[in-house]
Amino acid sequence: MSHRIRTRTLTVLAVLLLAAPFTPATAQAAEAAHVEGSLPSGAAYLMDMPARWNGTVLLYSHGYTPVGAPNPARNSPDDATRQLLLDQGYALIGSSYATNGWAVTDAVPDQLATLDAFTSRFGPARRTLAWGTSYGGLVTTAIAERHASRIAGSLSMCGLVQGGVANWNSTLDPVFALKALLAPDSGIRLTGLGSPAVAAEQAAAMAGAVTEAQKTAAGRARIALAAALHNIPGWNDPSRPRPAPTDWDSRQAAQYQALVGLVRLPAFAWRQEAETRAGGNMSWNTGVDYTSMLGRSPYLKEVTELYGKAGLSLKTDLASLGRAPRISADPNAVDWMSRTSTFTGRLTEPQLNIHTTGDALIPVQAESAYARAASAGGSTSLLRQRYVDNAGHCTFSTGEQIAALHTLEDRVDTGRWSRSAPVDLNARATEAAPASAARYLAYRPASYPRPYDRSSAWDGPRG
C-alpha cells in the first residue's frame, strides 16, 4: 500500500503517529492526521483521525459513481457532517472502490481492506460502525449481512436496500410502460444493450418520446402511469415548493422531470454497465400484472385523475400494457446479481435505515422491501427504519445524519432502540447541529412494487 500523510503540525507526536500503531487511549493525546493511500486493488482510501479520538471509527461507503466520472475516496457524506463528527472525536475512513459502476464485488472488499489499513496504522478501534448513502447503503448492508464480525452496527441512508435484482426490475417497469404506450413501434431496446453507444442511442430515443408526450394531456397521463409503476413521488425536488395534495399537474410535472433523468442514466447507461458485469440481462417482467401493480401504488389516484382529464381510458391502456411482449431474463445474470447484490435480511448486529419520503431515484418503498427481507430472515428486532420529510435523494441535513448515528450508537451500547422515535431523532438532530433542519416524522411507506430477496418465497423470473 502507498500512503501520503499530511498532519496539521509537525510535532514529535505526529512523527510517532506515522511510525507506529497505537491504541485509542494513546490516540486521544496525538495530533490530528489526514491519511491518503491506495490499496492493492487500485482503490484509493481516505482516513481522518481527530486529535482526541473517541475510539469509534466510521466506515463510510459512498454512492454510485458512473463509469468515466472522477472516483475519489470519500469518508463522509459531506464536509459539514465530516467536520462535526471529527469535532466529536470520530475517526472517519472510506475508499473509492477499485472500479466505477455497479461495483459491489469491488466495494465490499475494498471497504474491509480500508478498515484493515486503518487498524494497521492506528491500532484497533474500540468500535466500528459502517454507514453509507445511496448505493453505499447497499454496500453497507452487504457488509452488515456478510461481514458482521467486522462491525458493531450499520446505518443505511437513502440506501438501495431493495437489492440489485429488485432495483433493476423496478427500473425496467417504467420504461417498459413508456415504450408500450408512447412508442410501441419504435424498436427501442430496453435490455441487452450491448455497449455504451447502444445504450446512449436507446436512451436518446426514449427521452425524445417522453419529451414529445409531455406536450399533450394524453401523454402526460401516460407518463404519470409509468411514474406510478416506479413509485416516483410528485414532490421530488427540494428546490421547488411542495405541490398541494391534489395539484395533479404540478405533481406530474415533477414526475416527468424525474423520469427523464431515469431514462438518461439508470435505465440505459447504468443498466448496460451492470449487464456487462452480470453477463447478461438480469431483469424480467414475464408474469407481471401491471394493473395489480398500479392498484398498489400510492399514486393511483393521480393517474386516475389525469386519465380522466385527458379523456383517456385507463382500462384500455392497461390492457395494451398487458398485451405488450414481455422481457425474459438470463438466468445466469439473475444468479450473479442475486449472489452479489441481493439480501437475506439476516442481520446479527443492529442496523438503522433512514430515507427521505420524496426520493425519486431510490423511492422510499425500498425500505418496505428490506423490512420484508428482515422479517423473512428473522432479524426484525435488529432493524429500525426512520423517515425524513423532504424531497430529493439523500437530502438529509447534517443534524439528521448525526442524529441517526447517535441513535445507532445507543442501540449498540444498550441493546435497546431507546430514544429512536421521530421526536427523539429530531431532538438529537437539533442538539447536534442547531442551525440544520430536523424533519423526522412518523411514516409508513407503501409496499415495494416487485421485491426480491434471498430469504422469502421464490421471487424469481417466471414464464
Tell me the role of every PLM-derived stretch:
Residues 30-463:
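C-terminal His-loop and adjacent cap/lid subdomain of alpha/beta-hydrolase
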Residues 1-29:
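Secretory targeting and sorting signals
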